[in-house]
Amino acid sequence: MVLVNEMTQSYAETCVQIIQSNNNTITIGSQSAGANGNISKFTLPRGILGAFSGLGWYYPDGWVVNRQGVKIDHEIRPTLEGIRDGRDEMLEAALSLIEEKTEEE
């Protein structure tokens, strides 16, 4: 079970892809940052600094991670009600899925 959200970025997205290579992996959460690859920095006139990712990052089937994020099996987003109640809805969903899988076995 892998939990991801918009804070999952760069090397963490690469780690998620590695874990997902196991067919038993379930990924839940919301879109990751889609921001992995090397950083190429440059300086424009007047000392203005800039940077960009110089690599495309893909799954073997061609899915582009850049700007789209990692693949998600179950999309779960926090709700206003859950936030008000101090609940971790993503963790609750993960535990529920684990319980379902355990009962199936």
Predicted stretch roles:
Residues 1-105:
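C-terminal "post-core" interaction segments
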